[in-house]
């Protein structure tokens, strides 16, 4: 049984496709249960964010597992399998572990070092726990990934590269407004309308406040949540008020920016709602989109959304920063420790089976000896039993210690399989994952099932 990841991110797919695969809590729960309904899959965890959709699962068969995950994604999203094949990537065994550590550390994010992904992975883990879909493998891997992410952010200066996609979006908006994002209070004298009251909206309000915004207007479907967000802004020293969600358009003629992060089923900002001649900077932080792209066609209206942020991120790519090198060193260290522990755990069943077989052989020989030498006294027989068992234990001690040490090292040898072959042990249900870190599409039953997109790893530089 090995961990398998089938996913899609801003590095492998267009935003329009990521939107179609985006999952709310309800869809994620249904999809998780559908995954567990497949015979090849025994655990499941889904990470769904603005920039990625990744299915983490444990499978008994690589080929069948990949096919099952792709079919479930097709059923959940309505995206045809041929389209999915062109954009999905696959990570397996040690490569899957490395990928999760890199992702959770913010090293595969659109904004290098962003911290939101740690919370998103934690939320995905908690949800999977509630669904009952997390077992020993995903529990161990996720906890290691979260620990690694914390180390990366506390032991390096990676946070300086960019706190979140929200800060990136606000900075891009400032640039497009002709303002200096490095200035002390570039938004001084400006007013912003924030739609939504969740984590993204709260972060947006915080960043707008740090940029010196003079006034904030909050609107949310649940009025009380908008009022709480306004109270927090007031406590931070930023004047804030609340408008009814249905009356949000009435505020357009008195604001300079509109930031939307609601995840609504319909557009929150439409061209027909914007007053003629209005000068507006629109920032869309939702997936699927909150703001109709057609708004950007209006005179005086500009738009920043996730798709445009992706483009800006790709165009602004640069070499690896020292903090990123330090972060990757931590990932390598934690990955080595995790995979070593996993290989040791994988070999324990084979070692136990070997000891049971040796004990059984010893017992059989003692029984035969007892029948051939019935005159041995109980005291003498007790010494014979102790001696035979002591010899068996001593003979097995060094090999079992050594095989655990060897298993802890990375390599292509499966030591539990070697023990089974050498000593004729019965095939065990728990087998070690291969140390392979890459897979070719040609190895799959249908060579076109997935496009293997190389995400950054602990041994590669970032795109």
Curated annotation (Swiss-Prot):
GO annotation terms (biological process): protoporphyrinogen IX biosynthetic process from glutamate
Binding site for NADP(+): 196-201
The keyword Transmembrane belongs to this UniProt entry's keyword annotation: no
EC number(s) given by UniProt: 1.2.1.70
Record-level Gene Ontology MF annotations: glutamyl-tRNA reductase activity; NADP binding
UniProt key word Plastid: no
Highest taxon listed in the record's lineage: Bacteria
Family per similarity comment: Belongs to the glutamyl-tRNA reductase family.
Additional facts recorded: During catalysis, the active site Cys acts as a nucleophile attacking the alpha-carbonyl group of tRNA-bound glutamate with the formation of a thioester intermediate between enzyme and glutamate, and the concomitant release of tRNA(Glu). The thioester intermediate is finally reduced by direct hydride transfer from NADPH, to form the product GSA.
Quaternary state and interactors: Homodimer.
Protein's name according to its UniProt entry: Glutamyl-tRNA reductase
Gene: hemA
